[in-house]
């Protein structure tokens, strides 16, 4: 189950942080590290700070885009410390651990951490089903990257340990949610249809697509429901083509 949980770091700029994150992961039983467009490649400093978790560094997946790191996942949770213009469903670390472990029983899950200085962009956060916020001391809330990973990884481990004990079981998510790849294709189809009908204008979509993403993220349609929505869009497209042909 734990091997299905990906720790995804976006554009990390210090190799020491990679090593410290690897150590934080391995102490909690997590080994699946993904590096998205790292500004520096893992080096001897990363290995040194990994302190026995060099295998996590050595086996890390290095990819160019966040989409590559999320491919095949059914649940994506992004870390966010800032209030955003567009609100999003928020989890605390404990809820994040429970939900991640429940879903990782069936499909890969991605826990996404942003850049050391500025975190994740709004566009990256919009690719997430949920955001997770750590309730740190408001007078001094600065957590470094490895600290943030450690907090979330600990809650994941606690949730996983609960599934191993007879007295407490974490309920597994068995509903077939679509993968991130399928959702992105749906959003592309939706935008294409809205452009074709004139509901939004090319190069001037405003906040409509962002708000629709939030709506469907909050609703989190199942795979069959997403197929119905795709069918509705296809029907609208067909009707629109027929009207133009007349």
Swiss-Prot record:
It is found in: Cytoplasm. It comes from Escherichia coli O6:K15:H31 (strain 536 / UPEC). GO terms for molecular function: RNA binding; tRNA (cytidine(32)/uridine(32)-2'-O)-methyltransferase activity. This is tRNA (cytidine/uridine-2'-O-)-methyltransferase TrmJ. Keywords: Cytoplasm, Methyltransferase, S-adenosyl-L-methionine, Transferase, tRNA processing. Its EC number is 2.1.1.200. The keyword tRNA processing applies. GO terms for cellular component: cytosol. Its main location: cytoplasm.
